[in-house]
Each structure stands twice: as C-alpha cells, then as structure tokens.
C-alpha cells in the first residue's frame, strides 16, 4: 500500500509540473489577474482568459 501511495504522489507531482510548464489544455476563465495565480506569476487576464496559462 505504501508503494502504491508513493507512485500516486509521484504521478500527481509530475502532472502538476507539466501543467505549470506547458499550460492547460483548456482555457482558464478569469475576471482579474489574481484569478491567474495558479498559472504562475506575472500571468495576465485578457478578454476573460488567463493568457499565459492557455495553450
């Protein structure tokens, strides 16, 4: 069970790394720049979407 949990944690961490490095596969809606914090620092909200987060 510990091995399964360790593998699961590693998969989650790698998926989060890929998410932040390459953006999301779908547009992230926002109203202000503060809504784009999950995409990284300095990402701006333009036309209702986080620009640097969306592919």
Swiss-Prot record:
Keywords: Disulfide bond, Secreted, Signal. One of its GO terms (cellular component) is extracellular region. Its main location: secreted. It is found in: Secreted. Residues 1-23 form the signal peptide. Expressed by the venom gland. It comes from the Eukaryota. Disulfide bonds join 30-45, 36-50, 39-53. Negative results: does not show any effect on Na(+), Ca(2+) currents, nor on voltage-gated and calcium-activated potassium channels. This is Neurotoxin BmP08. It comes from Olivierus martensii. The lineage of its organism: Eukaryota, Metazoa, Ecdysozoa, Arthropoda, Chelicerata.
């Amino acid at each position: 069970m510990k091995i399964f949990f360790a593998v699961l944690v590693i998969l989650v961490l790698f998926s989060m790394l890929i998410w932040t490095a390459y953006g999301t596969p779908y547009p992230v809606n926002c109203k202000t720049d503060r809504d784009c914090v999950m995409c990284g620092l300095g990402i701006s909200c333009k036309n209702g979407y986080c620009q640097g987060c969306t592919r």
